[in-house]
């Protein structure tokens, strides 16, 4: 079985890995030699036992990669047109993953990576990459954070009908690429009045 070099970081529960991934760079390598890097600025966690988790009820052909060992890529499609990239976490055979919600791309408008559908479109990530591995010879990899993160905001996830009250979304307050800000959480966590 393959193992991602990022296995140690991703062997944590999704709620811990989601925080640890902030500031890291998601690297996309293309067959023509191009490489695009985006700094991870927003994540959401999904764990076994969470009613919003795709693997909450059972493993299926569609969500199989979510049950993969830490570092396996889980890509799914929503609304029949947008793709979302997740990284399997914690342990094999356990439904646990981190959704990459937003990336900040150097020298590119913030809107390009503001949301899972946009960042996947910008990086040409689709179901063909589902089940792949993070690593130096893979189309997808991570690089360590290389500068201070700034202010970390914790709040609830977006667009759910179940598990809506779980505060399992994190983002870097200073990033212009955050998909949706929670001004109340920012005020509370940064000590500023609304």
UniProtKB/Swiss-Prot annotation:
Pfam families recorded for this chain?
Pur_DNA_glyco
Family from the record: Belongs to the DNA glycosylase MPG family.
What Gene3D superfamilies does UniProt report for this protein, alphabetically? Answer: Methylpurine-DNA glycosylase (MPG)
Domain of life of the source: Bacteria
Q: Please verify whether the record's keywords include DNA damage.
A: yes
Q: What is this protein called?
A: Putative 3-methyladenine DNA glycosylase
Keywords for this protein: DNA damage, DNA repair, Hydrolase
The record's section on SUPFAM superfamilies has: FMT C-terminal domain-like (SSF50486)
GO molecular function, one example? DNA binding
Organism classification: Bacteria, Bacillati, Cyanobacteriota, Cyanophyceae, Synechococcales
Q: What is its EC number?
A: 3.2.2.-
Signal peptide start and end residues: none
Q: Which InterPro entries match?
A: Formyl_transferase-like_C_sf (IPR011034), MPG (IPR003180), MPG_sf (IPR036995)
Some GO term, biological process aspect, for this entry: which one? base-excision repair
């Amino acid at each position: 079985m393959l193992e991602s070099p990022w296995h140690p970081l991703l062997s944590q529960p999704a709620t811990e890995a989601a925080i640890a991934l902030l500031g890291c760079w998601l690297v996309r390598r293309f067959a023509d030699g191009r490489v695009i890097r985006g700094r991870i600025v927003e994540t959401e966690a999904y764990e076994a036992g969470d009613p919003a988790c795709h693997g909450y009820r059972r493993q299926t052909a569609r969500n199989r990669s979510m049950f993969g060992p830490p570092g396996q890529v889980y890509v799914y499609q929503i609304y029949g047109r947008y793709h979302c990239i997740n990284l399997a976490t914690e342990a094999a055979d356990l439904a646990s993953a981190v959704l990459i919600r937003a990336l900040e791309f150097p020298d590119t408008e913030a809107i390009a990576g503001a949301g899972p559908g946009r960042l996947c479109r910008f990086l040409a990530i689709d179901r063909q990459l589902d089940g792949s591995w993070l690593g130096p010879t893979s189309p997808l990899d991570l690089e360590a954070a290389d500068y201070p993160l700034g202010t970390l905001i914790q709040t609830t996830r977006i667009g759910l009908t179940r598990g809506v009250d779980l505060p399992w979304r994190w983002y870097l307050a200073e990033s212009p690429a955050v998909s949706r800000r929670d001004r109340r959480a920012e005020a509370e966590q940064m000590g500023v009045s609304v």
